[in-house]
């Protein structure tokens, strides 16, 4: 996860945004396969050169059909996930129907964009299933892209190499999980801010399933 490093406070609205102040950790990946969305994320949180935790959950269930992976500042990610959960509940109570995954991602994009001069330091993946599997990537300014596969965090350049090589649209769910965990493992081997196994969430027409895969069992 991201950590604050001693340094100046240069940047918009006085918040430190240059590389001397903020460093990002984490590896999270998402992909669509066989009418499902697969999300995976490592378990390590860092504070400077210290491993602050080996048991962090970086995949947040926003409802029973949509989830979000987080990389960046822990506090920023927590407040955003809390806001989104409550907005989804409010929408369901008001409209008697669940909001689409696109609606959730667009709402998050609007929240991030509205704070662009005092931004949330996060990079996020939103994935879920409404009438079909959906996968979106968002940066700290609210830019949003829809993808078949994606990765975020400091280990993402390494993870992308695996995804580019192994992703196919006809992957089964089990094959997609192996691709995702292989991408996480490859990043963990080279990125000091990622490690300690992976959480995996699979979301499809019948709901969602979560599981933890220890590092030694990552493909």
UniProtKB/Swiss-Prot annotation:
Keywords attached to this Swiss-Prot or TrEMBL record, sorted alphabetically, are: Autocatalytic cleavage, Cytoplasm, Hydrolase, Protease, Proteasome, Threonine protease, Zymogen
Among the record's GO biological process terms, what is one? proteasomal protein catabolic process
Q: What Enzyme Commission number(s) does the record list for this chain?
A: 3.4.25.1
What subcellular compartments does it reside in?
Answer: Cytoplasm
Q: Which InterPro entries match?
A: Ntn_hydrolases_N (IPR029055), Pept_T1A_Psome_bsu_arc (IPR019983), Pept_T1A_subB (IPR000243), Proteasome_sua/b (IPR001353), Proteasome_suB-type (IPR023333)
Q: How is its activity regulated?
A: The formation of the proteasomal ATPase PAN-20S proteasome complex, via the docking of the C-termini of PAN into the intersubunit pockets in the alpha-rings, triggers opening of the gate for substrate entry. Interconversion between the open-gate and close-gate conformations leads to a dynamic regulation of the 20S proteasome proteolysis activity.
Q: Which Gene3D superfamilies match?
A: Glutamine Phosphoribosylpyrophosphate, subunit 1, domain 1 (3.60.20.10)
**Which Pfam families does the record match to this protein?**
Proteasome
- Superkingdom of source: Archaea
Proregion residues excised on maturation: 1-25
UniProt lists the family membership as follows:
Belongs to the peptidase T1B family.
NCBIfam families assigned to the protein according to its UniProt record, in alphabetical order: arc_protsome_B
Q: Quote the HAMAP family the UniProt record gives.
A: Proteasome_B_A
* Record's function text: Component of the proteasome core, a large protease complex with broad specificity involved in protein degradation.
Protein name, UniProt field: Proteasome subunit beta 2
Q: What is the lineage of its organism?
A: Archaea, Thermoproteota, Thermoprotei, Desulfurococcales, Desulfurococcaceae
């Amino acid at each position: 996860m991201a950590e604050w490093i001693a340094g100046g406070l240069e940047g918009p609205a006085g918040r430190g945004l240059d590389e001397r102040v903020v460093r990002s950790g984490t590896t999270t990946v998402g992909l669509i396969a066989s009418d499902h969305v697969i999300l995976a994320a490592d378990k390590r949180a860092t504070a400077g050169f210290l491993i602050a935790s080996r048991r962090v959950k970086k995949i947040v269930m926003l409802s029973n059909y949509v989830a979000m992976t987080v990389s960046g500042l822990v506090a920023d990610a927590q407040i955003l996930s809390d806001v989104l959960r409550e907005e989804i509940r409010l929408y369901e109570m008001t409209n008697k129907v669940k909001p689409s995954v696109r609606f959730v991602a667009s709402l998050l994009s609007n929240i991030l964009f509205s704070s662009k001069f005092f931004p949330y330091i996060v990079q996020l993946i939103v994935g879920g299933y409404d009438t079909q599997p959906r996968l979106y990537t968002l940066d700290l300014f609210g830019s949003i892209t829809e993808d078949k596969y994606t990765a975020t965090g400091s280990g993402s350049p390494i993870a992308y190499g695996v995804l580019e090589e192994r992703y196919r649209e006809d992957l089964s769910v089990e094959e997609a999980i192996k691709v995702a965990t292989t991408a996480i493992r490859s990043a963990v081997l080279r990125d000091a801010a990622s490690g300690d196994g992976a959480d995996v969430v699979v979301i499809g027409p019948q709901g969602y399933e979560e599981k933890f895969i220890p590092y030694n069992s990552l493909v």
